[in-house]
């Protein structure tokens, strides 16, 4: 039986994906005549406590050999999630979502399709679309001022830049992350030409605010750069110098918790006698929950006593972060291009909306990104479905689902499965959000991509097993080929690619802290960097990579063949995971060869002969 319905196919659903509130959606069915008489109805329900299913009778559009065609147009008025299936109104049959997103006939309840409806005025920064990001873990990128003294006596300086980060527990069994390799803002400034040479447009920096660990997610002072990294003035200089290279800087904002060792909480007493922990009359006391039912006597992030949680709805905290002259305002006016919100799905929607207001008050082109590990449209939290991607909160999110699908594909997952997972995210996310989603293969929170691709899975084994491991020889060589394929996909999917520092030279490492080694500046691995530079140049020159629709043409036998269809140009990408050369037909009718473990990208002007531009990176 042919496909009855597939929301990825423009014949069955237009427009593709999420829609703005008030927009009309056209849905069509193709019913084989062997099913007999049917009277199909669209059954649509908005998710909400008082919302009920609404039945829309579909009109008969005519026949083709052995098939009857039906359609319906509906206007979706309010932002939210809508779910739908089709009732045939005969013999209790319905059409529900089956494998590969195709509709199947069922006599029972089944999976529905989703339509995300977002705010009609939702816009995201145009300056982000079509660009390239690069993530830097500041302590581990480049030491611009060498052998500088430690600003606090409890910091341990690591002069050997090839050393493995500390991983052994201390005498109490804890990990204090107290080893510092000395990376700083000056080091980033020095490497701006290197970054621009790779086509980087934006830097995403892990936290730079004063904090007493090398990762700096335990903020001690929101308004000052950590003194080991530099000064506030040096940050402003970095922003100005980066702008000369066409590079913006996005900061990491950690607003769900502070450090216990901070001027706000001050459990350790580093900041005198003030702070919420030591002074019941502290202006910061209301930011925290003190109660004997909690370990340590206060609520902390996932039970880590060094990370006391804040009440994000406390008026004084909200004003401190989002008010005029507050944290967001201060850093954007110092030159930052935007913020990435750490653990965004643990922040209340109302707080995120206030952060958005603060960001956009400075400029609509300032960027607000959220850390969300799953499909951001379907996340639950605070006892309700999260709304931060519907137009009043985040601009977009970190795209972990793409990362997982791409890495699994280059390792051997069926191409069709990867394509369906990617299309599902594209379908669910509002267009302004998917076009600015941050696509990556590695981060400071995950194993490095080359390790995932080429090395043995850790499978829950501890740091002692992970320490010192790396692949060499044939495994390394094949891993680099697969990594190149993976980045070719990441650079050409909807969204913006983000390269994690060191991936371009094949750095390896399992999870924290092994994925956070110092950048190996004396590495001789040069094969991936020119490819990434070419891919960045392609993104900059082809408008289809800004907002072009994704259409999968073939996903089978280790072949992933898809298009990005723009207003004036169409890019066609063929990735060949197989071990033999393939000859693949293009949409234009021509054919192209693609090498084993290789990819080909063809760009043509819409309405003209192909090969306006031709890229074949073998």
Which functions belong to the PLM regions below?
Residues 29, 36-48, 53-54, 82-84, ...:
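Beta-strand-rich binding/interaction modules
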Residues 29, 136, 195, 205, ...:
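Conserved, mostly hydrophobic/aromatic
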Residues 139, 382-383, 435-471, 487-525:
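Aromatic/acidic polysaccharide-binding cleft in carbohydrate-active enzymes
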Residues 1-24, 50-135, 141-161, 167-168:
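The feature marks proteins involved in alpha-glucan
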Residues 31-33, 592-618:
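C-terminal beta-strand-rich structural cap/linker in extracellular carbohydrate-active enzymes
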Residues 137-201, 208-334, 355-361:
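Substrate-binding/active-site clefts of carbohydrate-active enzymes
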Residues 14-16, 26, 553-586:
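Carbohydrate-binding surface patches
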Residues 239-248, 256-257, 262-273, 327, ...:
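Active-site-proximal helices and loops of the catalytic beta/alpha 8
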């Amino acid at each position: 039986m042919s496909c009855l319905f597939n929301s990825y196919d423009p014949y069955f659903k237009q427009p593709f994906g999420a829609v703005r509130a008030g927009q009309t959606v056209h849905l069509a069915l193709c019913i084989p005549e062997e099913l007999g008489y049917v009277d199909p109805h669209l059954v649509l329900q908005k998710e909400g406590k008082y919302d009920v299913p609404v039945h829309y009778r579909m009109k008969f559009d005519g026949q083709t050999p052995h098939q009857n065609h039906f359609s319906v147009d509906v206007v979706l008025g309010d932002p939210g999630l809508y779910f739908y299936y089709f009732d045939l109104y005969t013999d209790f049959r319905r059409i529900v979502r089956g494998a590969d997103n195709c509709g199947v006939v069922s006599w029972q309840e089944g999976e529905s399709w989703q339509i995300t409806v977002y705010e009609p005025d939702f816009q995201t920064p145009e300056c982000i679309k079509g660009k390239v990001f690069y993530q830097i873990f500041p302590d581990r990128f480049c030491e611009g001022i060498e052998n500088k003294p430690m600003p606090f006596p409890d910091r341990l300086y690591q002069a050997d830049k090839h050393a493995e980060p500390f991983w052994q527990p201390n005498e109490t069994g804890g990990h204090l992350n107290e080893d510092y390799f000395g990376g700083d803002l000056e080091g980033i400034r020095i490497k701006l030409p290197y970054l621009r040479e790779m086509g980087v447009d934006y830097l995403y920096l892990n936290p730079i605010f004063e904090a007493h660990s090398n990762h700096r997610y335990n903020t001690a002072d929101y308004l000052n750069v950590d003194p080991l990294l530099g000064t506030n003035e040096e940050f402003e200089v970095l922003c100005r110098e980066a702008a000369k290279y066409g590079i913006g800087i996005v900061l990491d904002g950690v607003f769900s918790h502070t450090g216990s060792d901070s001027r706000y909480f001050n459990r350790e007493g580093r900041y005198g006698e003030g702070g919420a922990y030591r002074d019941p009359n502290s202006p910061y006391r209301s930011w925290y929950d003190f109660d004997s039912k909690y370990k340590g006597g206060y609520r902390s992030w996932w039970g880590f006593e060094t990370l006391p949680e804040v009440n994000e709805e406390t008026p004084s905290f909200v004003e401190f972060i989002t008010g005029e002259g507050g944290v967001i305002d201060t850093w954007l006016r110092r030159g930052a291009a935007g913020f990435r919100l750490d653990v965004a799905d643990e922040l209340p929607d109302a707080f995120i909306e206030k952060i958005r207001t603060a960001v956009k008050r400075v400029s609509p082109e300032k960027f607000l990104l959220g850390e969300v590990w799953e499909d951001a449209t379907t996340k639950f939290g605070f006892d309700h479905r999260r709304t931060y991607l519907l137009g009043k909160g985040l601009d977009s999110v970190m795209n972990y689902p793409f990362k997982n699908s791409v890495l699994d594909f280059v390792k051997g997952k069926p191409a069709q499965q990867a394509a369906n997972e990617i299309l599902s995210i594209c379908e669910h996310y509002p267009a302004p959000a998917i076009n600015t989603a941050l696509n990556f293969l590695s981060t400071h929170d995950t194993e490095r991509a080359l390790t995932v691709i080429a090395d043995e899975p850790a499978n829950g084994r501890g740091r002692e097993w992970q320490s010192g491991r790396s692949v060499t020889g044939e495994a390394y060589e094949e891993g680099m080929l697969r990594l190149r394929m993976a980045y070719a996909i990441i650079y050409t999917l909807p969204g913006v690619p983000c390269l994690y520092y060191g991936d371009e030279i094949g750095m390896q490492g399992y999870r924290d802290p092994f994925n956070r080694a110092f950048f190996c500046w004396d590495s001789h691995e040069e094969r991936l960097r020119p490819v990434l530079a070419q891919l960045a140049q392609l993104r900059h020159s082809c408008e289809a990579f800004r907002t072009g629709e994704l259409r999968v043409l073939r996903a089978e036998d280790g072949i992933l063949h898809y298009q990005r269809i723009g207003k004036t140009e169409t890019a066609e990408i063929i990735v060949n995971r197989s071990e033999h050369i393939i000859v693949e037909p293009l949409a234009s009718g021509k054919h192209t060869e693609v090498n084993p473990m290789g990819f080909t990208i063809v760009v043509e002007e819409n309405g003209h002969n192909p090969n306006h531009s031709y890229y074949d990176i073998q």
